[in-house]
Amino acid sequence: QTFNNQNTFKVIDLKDANEYKFKVRANKANVACEESDVFSTVTTPKRVSNKSVKSRSRRKITYSFKKVNATGYEYQWSTHRNFKYNFKTKTTKSTRVTIKTAQSRKRYYVRVRAYKLDENKNKVYGSWSKVKRVKVR
């Protein structure tokens, strides 16, 4: 595309969790200059939807969520709804996890987000899912 007198541009309608590569070339009076190096970016993954969170046995929480186009998932659990303190974070490639370190008879909150790795192996995160609550047996 051609952009007159602009140093920035916006590309729309990109798919979630995909890598895109761009090259830029300046034109002046119908004379094309050299192309730039390749710029690479990864779009953020879609927000993950929760399926279920249950505690069927003592000290265990089973948490499942829907699969999205992503490299993996990061999930958190806490005894506080806002996750400001007293929370733990782990990563997984599965859409079903079991948390085995919960305390009996306590209420826990869990959430998850997807991530995609860019070409430099940096994680690009999607939004956190809605927070789900469970009481441990």
Identify the role of each PLM range.
Residues 11-30, 102-120:
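Beta-strand-rich modules
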Residues 1-15, 74-103:
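Recognizes extended acidic, P/S/T-rich segments that occur
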Residues 26, 48-51, 70-71, 78, ...:
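Long alpha-helical scaffolds
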Residues 16, 31-68, 123-137:
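Pro/Thr/Ser/Gly-rich low-complexity, intrinsically disordered linker/stalk tracts
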Residues 20-22, 65, 73, 83, ...:
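Conserved hydrophobic/aromatic "anchor" residues
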Residues 45-46, 67-69, 79-81, 101-103, ...:
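Non-catalytic surface loops within mature trypsin-like serine protease
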